[in-house]
Each structure stands twice: as structure tokens, then as C-alpha cells.
């Protein structure tokens, strides 16, 4: 089975109503849609969305032949405030229930920021506990919960030990295609520019991938190596286009990204 291509409803798609989102995703050749939540996007998929609307979303997406690639919550768990973490847990738990009702097997959440002060270990312990509990909730429905390698967790020296500490078979990491070639602290891309050491760290926990501006000359060689490694491993998960383009011709731009994806994945 080949890798699949999904449209994350980031900036390019954030103002499209559901019907237009589906039309654009189909026209550009995506296999699925990754519904980004918590920003009030026009698709209307939110933790507290009306149940009737969520049923409509499922019916329309199913009828289109597209898949629900991910229910993507922006709930994060770095706060030292118990009430704030509890609120984030509630939103994430609702996202798991939405994924179950959609027939979606993936929910993404965030870590997200780890301080460099005396609270560091407490924050990491809190995040680990929350991730383990969410994975436990999702497990009976066959749903994978993933933390994105975002914020402080672009550093594999933080993300990978946390994934190991969660120690749940349905928990993993979304690689956010941050290759850390210019990192000032923590793990940094080696001088030869190969991403292999980074890939080898996160690969055992990899569930999905987010891509950004793959066409940039300074990024393209790293994406080429990433896809070579994925193909050599036979990885067949979802790769998302987290598109930030907001210009006048999104359909053309998304089609070009689709062509680039298929070229790299071939």
C-alpha cells in the first residue's frame, strides 16, 4: 500500500465552507482531509460542534470518497495550571469521540512548550501523563493518539523519550518536517546535512507527517531524503500538506503540491 496524501485545513483551507473544502480537496487529488480544530475554521468541526452538524460532515465526506485522515486538536498540556490542563483534556477527549463517530483512526494533540527552568521535569511528567490517559481512552475504538513534534518537541531528544515513557501501543508522533538544521539548542542536523540520524530517532514512533513548502531549495533535498527513507521502510501512512498559501489560485497551488508529493513518493 502506498503513502496517502491529506489536506490539513491550515491557512489555505481555513476559510472554505465544508462543500468548498471537499471540492478543492477532490480537485487537487488528495486522499483525505485533516480537520484542524480550535481556530474557528469554516468547516465547523470543533470539539463543541453540534452533533447534527458533525453527522452532516461525515455524510458529505463519506459521499465524496475522501477519507478522514485526522481529527487534529490543538489541545496542549504544558500548562502548570491544573484547570487549564483539565480543559485541554476535555477538548482532546471530545476530539477522540468525534474521530470515533467519523470512523477516523487518528487524533493529533500538542505537547507543546517545555521551559528551561526548575519546572521542566514537572511539565514533562504532566504531558506524559496526559498523553498516556488520552491513548488509554482512544484504545478501545482503535484510534491512535499522536503528539506532533511541534514547539519544544521538534527536538527528538524530548519527543522520543516522552513517546517511550507513554508506553502505549496506540500512541505515536507526527513528524512536523522540522529538520533542525539551524537549531541553537538541543538536537541539530549534522554537518553533512543527512536527516538519517533524525529519522532513525522518530521512525519507531511515526504515525503521520506534516509537510511545508517542500519546493524551497533549502528544504527540498531534506524532503527527498525523507521520502527515500520512508519508501525503503515501506511506510504507508498519511502525509499532510499543511499549506500556508493564501494567494489568488489555491487550486493550482494545491495541484502542484500533489504532483510534487507523487513525484517524491513514487
Residue ranges of predicted features:
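Active-site mouth loops of central-metabolism enzymes
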Residues: 3-17, 75-89, 117-123, 187, ...
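Conserved, mostly hydrophobic/aromatic
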Residues: 7, 25, 33, 61, ...
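Acidic/histidine-rich catalytic cores of soluble enzymes
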Residues: 10, 32, 71, 129-228
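Short, acidic/polar
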Residues: 14-25, 84-97, 189-200, 222-226
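Catalytic domains of carbohydrate-active enzymes, especially glycoside hydrolases
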Residues: 19-38, 103
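A structural motif
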Residues: 30, 66, 99, 104, ...
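Active-site acidic/histidine proton-transfer and metal-coordination neighborhood
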Residues: 55-67, 77-175, 180
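C-terminal helical cap(s) of enzyme catalytic domains, especially alpha/beta-barrels
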Residues: 249-266
